């Protein structure tokens, strides 16, 4: 009983003061969507490096998991693996539209990601009949004008006498814009195959984007969910939406 009482006291104490970088929105505000959008923009500078006092991770750079690509039949096959990918630019998102339903704790955002720069390590293997070409090195690139739909669904959890908002895993869907990709040291720096392969990759960049988009969507969804729940777990529902 005593540990529970201590925990409730600590939670109440932590939730006592909302910091100035979190803008509180009134539930009955006829422009509550605009208020929430302004609140997100106010919080943006803190998103970049994180909020240590709330145990919120930073959004820059965004780390992606392994990306694997395999295309073609056995006699003309391309396989590639990309690791250690870091993405910069997610914090520069633009909120184009928000529809909220506070009674259902649902928020639907339409975002624009103007520019995402990424860098990582790649390993590539190409088999064309009896010819086998291999390479490994650095991969860099830029994605521009990515449209992003984010769906947030939450529920209230009661702790002691207070209610807190917790979100289910976010749903993130990206729509591809423009892209450019560059691989270094292709085929041990071959002066002919290297540039030619980079041209082919960029001419067929949709193939690569089909593989990276689900990984990017999941990474963004996991990060946004964690950030939101870290914040809402520190303040009661009534404090955030009086």
Task: Give, region by region, the residue ranges found by the protein language model.
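Hydrophobic-cavity lipid-handling domains and compact docking modules
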Residues: 17-177
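Cleavable N-terminal signal peptides of Sec/SRP-targeted secreted and luminal proteins
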Residues: 1-17
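Short, charged/polar low-complexity linear motifs in solvent-exposed/disordered segments
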Residues: 126-127, 184, 226-228
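C-terminal helix/juxtamembrane-tail motif
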Residues: 15-23, 222-242
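Extended amphipathic ligand-handling, pore-lining, and cofactor/metal-binding catalytic surfaces
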Residues: 163-217
